[in-house]
Amino acid sequence: MAPRGLPGSAVLAAAVFVGGAVSSPLVRSDHSGSHPLPSKTETTPSPTNNNGNGHPEYIAYALVPVFFVMGLFGVLICHLLKKKGYRCTTEAEQDVEGEKVEKIELNDSVNENSDTVGQIVQYIMKNEANVDILAAMVEDNNVCDPESPVTPSTPGSPPVSPGPLSPGVTPGKHICGHHLHTVGGPVERDVCHRCRHKRWHFIKPTNKSKEGRPRRQGEVTVLSVGRFRVTKVEPKSNQKERRSLMSVSGTDSVNGEVPVTPVKRQQSDSE
């Protein structure tokens, strides 16, 4: 109920004002008027996954000095071993020139129209042992087996009658001794089918035997890992002492006396 001194409309207005003040946002009371206070909201950054977003350039900058230091460390180790009488070598150094010559000749003989059989034969012919075995098999088949196919280049083969020639072509002999013929038969012209289409590679006569690097006198292999090898060469003074001992022992054995060791000589000199 409303108080007695106040009218009902005044009480209703006061109630509406109080309810609006409670439900409205914060306002600043000022003589100029009421202005709403700005609300401050704080946003927390969401955690992002930085595992995949790294910096690979920093890793490269760190790896390059590491490899550089490792190379210098290896050179230092080889230098120290060389001072102590060891020798660090690789087996691939001796065959560098031979491999270059073989690659040049193979590149010259390779043709774009080479078939699969020619490539297989080329890979087989790279091994000298296969070449020798194949040559021996061809000789055995030509000499021992009377039913083996006879090629025009085989010694003792009957003359082959040339086939029909086109006008303007002079007949000639079949001269292709630079490769092996697997199938014998009449030849139409002065070249065979493979020579005409250039489907056969030249066979390189390999008579030389691969000889390893000649070892020095007194050279002993200490460590061998793959192609890396560490050898030790004895000083020349020890070799001269051994030679002198061998010469002395040889003269003593000729005279019929037992060779005396250096220890016994020192004992006899002290007595």
Curated annotation (Swiss-Prot):
Pfam families in the cross-refs: RELT
Region of interest (Disordered), ranges: 27-52, 144-168, 231-271
Residue spans, topological domain Extracellular: 24-57
First and last residue of the signal peptide: 1-23
Biological process according to GO: positive regulation of p38MAPK cascade
Transmembrane segment boundaries: 58-78
Modification type Phosphoserine: residues: 109, 114, 244, 247
Role description: Induces activation of MAPK14/p38 cascade, when overexpressed. Induces apoptosis, when overexpressed.
Family named by the database record: Belongs to the RELT family.
The protein, known as: RELT-like protein 1
Source organism of the structure: Bos taurus (Bovine)
Gene that encodes the chain: RELL1
